[in-house]
């Protein structure tokens, strides 16, 4: 019964979501507080807002999902929200993930039962401008009242559907997953140039970014820290 209620409730939201000024204000407050907590009120919280426009000049990935500015959330109107919902929220534009103590057959049966009556919508064809090849370095230095200096580097990589996507995923683990990873072993433990360092991928559908982020140890300049990271990347290419 609970499984049926779960799927039914989600289909009901897609079919006839309750829009009102009151519900919008409640959710607006939630998102604005999340924006403040994650992006404005903690050290390095706005790194994504600073890095994305450097990496993307044409592609919409230059916009953080939560918005570029708090005013974008504060000024959203009920009409805009409704238009967005009815443009994109449709069974022919959705992926339903079902996990738990339920068989495949039952999941299909319940999905067909509750989503089968939700009408299709004319979803616009996804045709986003592709990011042109980056031909020069883009760099930004920001001075803030933060506990430690931090270094953030990003390299363009393939999209999620490209076979090499999994190569980048494994590469990020080779560089920073665990104490024996290259960056941790060489730059944190042996040379003690960083107190912490991490490598990860963005996981984007379109061409994404390969990130390296670290906090240099006390007394280590950002220039020395960056040079050490580049040396490790060169070693990785040659070995």
Model-predicted regions and their roles:
Residues 60, 82-86, 138-142, 197-202:
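Short beta-strand/turn micro-motifs at beta-sheet edges
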Residues 153, 163-175, 183-187:
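Active/ligand-binding-proximal structured segments within catalytic/core domains
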Residues 18-36, 103, 122-136, 188, ...:
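Acidic/histidine-enriched alpha-helical segments
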Residues 1-45, 60, 70-93, 103, ...:
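Active-site-adjacent, His/Asp/Glu-enriched structural segments that form or flank metal-binding
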Residues 57-58, 62, 90-91, 95-159, ...:
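An aromatic/glycine/proline-enriched structural segment found at the starts
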